Structures are given as structure tokens and as C-alpha cells.
Amino acid sequence: MSLGMLSPHLNTPPPNNQGILIGDKVYSEVFLAIDNSIIPEDRLSTTPSMLDGLDHETETDLRILGCERIQSAGILLRLPQVAMATGQVIFQRFFFSKSFVKHNFEIVAMACVNLASKIEESPRRVRDVINVFHHLKQGKGKKSTPLILDQNYINTKNQVIKAERRILKELGFCVHVKHPHKIIVMYLQVLECEKNQMLVQTAWNYMNDALRTSAFVRFEPETIACACIYLAARVLQIPLPSKPHWFLLFGATKEDIKEICINTMKLYSREKPHSEQLERQVEKRKIFLEEARLKARGQNPNGTPALASINGFSPASKPSSPRDVKMDDKSPNSKLKEPENRQLFAKSPLNGSIKKEDGKVFQNGKNHSRSRSRSTSRSPHRHRRSHSGTYSSHSSHSPSPRQKARRPSPISQLRTDRDRPSETSRHSNKRRRSRSRSRSNSRERVRDRDHIKHKQERSGSGHHWDHRDRERDRSRDHGRNKRQSRSHSGHSHSRHRR
């Protein structure tokens, strides 16, 4: 059955034990064959699902349920029995390499049906496969609701396509399956029992039921065919040659046939698996593995970093963290400046005048009115800063309206002289006035410049605009002179009348 190998001589290892490098592995020989791939015994005892925490019974139920879904979907899709058998064998092979916890068995079953239909040259659309599995999931005896073509359907379709690629990659594109269907008919012809239709059909049925077990990934198809014929003959009580045993002629052993028959008969005494219960168990294991993975990384289940220490240290329990800012505490500069400000300025909400702490009132000047307007701002931030005396911005506040000057009495004159602002504050007020005047003058210059520029642009477009402007200016001057002459004449007449 083997086609050959890549070494120079057939069935001889390469010289000097030099293997063939494929990827990151070194292989001594490469055989191209159409034989079924047999899983070794060491991989059967510890499957990936068992390593993830699933028990043997749960894994067996999941395998049986997945194969039943593939068989039922193939019947509804009108696939040949060979295609359904190929899908079940691929399903069994894949989950001896991957875990049921990390891969959804229903998505993998859809991908196996889709892939098997292509292998056996009877392809079906992915949409039809998804619709059939949706119908089977709703259960028998219940009203079937059609699948809505929404975002959930698109996600399922993409998952099926990705699962099909994953199966091909994991199996190394060795998805050919040699089925024992033809072998059964050939062996019965050798035994001269091919005319017994009951025996042929019973052996065929046992072979289809054996697809739910691991027999097709553990034994050769010839051994499986002999076991199915042996089991059907025992049930129907049909005698077959026993001295020597007839199956020894076809290369099968008594131990292998016995194991295949026992595993097949266990299916009929086994309780039917419940998909909801199995899905809940798989989900629990998935959550447990995710929490264990996050715990190994030092994170909580919600993804936040976990800090494990003896004293139960937490950044929030730090007594004096540099990020904790107490609003009641004030800087030493504000504590020093606060009594001075209280002594200089005591606000009166009634008349806007400034009181000293001894209760005496005097009329405030221009500088005090500016400080009062800043301190009575609506913003609490500005009020706090102006009250503490640590912030003074004169450009952002407009001066208060001037009050009418009153002639003070001699006693109040002495008080005002004593509390009169210094020369520096007076010069600062002059500086402010000069700044405001310079700003207003600069604004007027900008306006005049823009007006002249606009005129020049209009004049550049054509001389008729300049002519119109001159005529308009002359008419305005003429009208203004007329009004002035009338007003002068009116004044003169009124004088003569008087």
C-alpha cells in the first residue's frame, strides 16, 4: 500500500542517520500511503480532553453525541453513507489531538460534514449544513423555528470555515479514510454467505454503529469487518468455520475482535447523552481553566492585577499617598498672608465699602474697588485664590465704575491719608490705563488699515470704483456743509429775534 519514500533506495534508511528536515522536525523516512492512520495506545490513555479535566465518561458521551449529529445531518442532507462515515472518522481523529474544552464539538461536527462531503465528491453548502444542525439541536417533537440570517449566523459560518481549516492542519491533510463496507461484502463472498441478506444487513448495521466508538482510529478496516461479521453471525446464530477460526485467514486476531465487539455492544446499554448537560460540564471546565490561567499570570478573574502579600498590602490603604490631596490643608504661604488680607480687607455686602477690623468705615478708592470686584467673583476658584492673596491677574478683570468724588472731612482726610495706597499701586493704575488706551488706539489703527486695504482692493479691480467713492465723498461733504450753514443761519435768526 505504501508508495515509497524520499530516500535514494526503497525501504532503506538514509545514510549516516541524516533525516529529512520538514519544518522544525527531522524525519528519517516519508511514506505516501492510503492506509488509515492508527493512533498509538499511549495517546488513547491520556487524551487532551482528559488533560483539561474532563473524565472519560463525559468525553465518550461527547464523541457519541457528535457522531450521532453527523449521521443525522448526513441523512437530512441526503449524503451517501460513505460521506457520513468519513465525517465521523475525521471527528474522532481530530479530538484525539485536540480537547473538547477548547473546541466546540458542534462547530467541529459541522466542519467534518462539510469536509467529508467534499472528500466523497458530494459537496453541500455551508448554509445547508448550519440549517440542518440548527434543526437537530431543537430536538424531536418540538416545533422547528427557522434560522434567522443575522450576525449570529455569519459568525457561525465563519467559525465552521475556520474549524475546517484547523482540522486539515491538525491532521496534516491526511483525511483519506479506508472504509470496511466493501470488505464486508468481499469476506461474506469468501464465506459463501453473501446470499443471506439478513446477515449482510446486520453486519452492515454493526459497522455503522461502530463509527461512534474509537474502533476506526485504533484498528485496521479488515479487522473491523471481521468483527462486524463475527458479531452478526453470533446474534443471528449462524455457524461459521472455527477450526481454525475463519478470521485468521484475513489477518485478524481474537483479542482485537473481542474488544471491538464489546465496545460496540456497550453502545446499546449506554444511556443516551444529553447535550445541555454536557455543554454545561464543558463550560464549567472552561471557566476553571481560564481562572487558573489568570491566577498563574497573577490576575483576578475579571482581568485586574492581583497583589498577594502577607500583610495584605493595597495601594489604597497607604496612609499618606502622594496622590491623596487634602483640600482643608493650606500652604504655609497662604497661612502667612491670610491675617494680613483679613486686616486690610473686610468686605461689606451692603455698600461695597471696606471695613477695618475695629469697625471703622472709609470710602474705597479705585485700587480697592478693583480688589473688591475680584474677590466677589462667582467662581469659587478665583474667590479662594484672591482671598488668600496668592493670585492676582488684572488683565482678566474689568475695573468697577467710578464713584463721584466727595469732599471728605478733616478727620476722614487723616484716616484716608494713613490708609492711602502707596506710589507703586498708583503707578500700576496708570500703567493699566495706558495699556487700555494703547489697546484701543491699536484697534483703531487696525480698523483704519483694514479700511484702507479694502479701498485699495476695490480700486485695483477697476477705476470706476474709485470714481464712485470720490463722488460719494463729495456728496457727503456737500450735505454736511449745507447742514452746518442751516444751523448757523438758524442761530443768527434766533439771536436777531431775541
Swiss-Prot record:
Gene Ontology CC terms, in alphabetical order: nuclear speck; nucleus
Biased composition (Basic residues): 367-387, 427-440, 479-498
Annotated spans, Disordered: 294-498
Positions where Phosphoserine occurs in the chain: 409, 412
Residue ranges the record marks as coiled coil: none
Comp. bias (Low complexity): 388-402
Claim: Transcription regulation is one of the keywords in the record: yes
Biased segments, Basic and acidic residues type: 321-341, 415-426, 441-478
UniProt subcellular location: Nucleus speckle; Nucleus, Nucleoplasm
Region named Cyclin-like 2: 182-266
BP terms from Gene Ontology: regulation of transcription by RNA polymerase II
Cyclin-like 1 as annotated region, ranges: 68-169
UniProt biased composition (Polar residues): 311-320
SUPFAM superfamilies xrefs: Cyclin-like
CDD domains per record: CYCLIN_CCNL1_rpt2
Annotated region described as RS, given as residue ranges: 366-396
SMART domains from the UniProt entry: CYCLIN, Cyclin_C
Note on domains (UniProt): Contains a RS region (arginine-serine dipeptide repeat) within the C-terminal domain which is the hallmark of the SR family of splicing factors. This region probably plays a role in protein-protein interactions.
Protein family membership: Belongs to the cyclin family. Cyclin L subfamily.
Function comment: Involved in pre-mRNA splicing.
Name the UniProt record assigns to this protein: Cyclin-L1
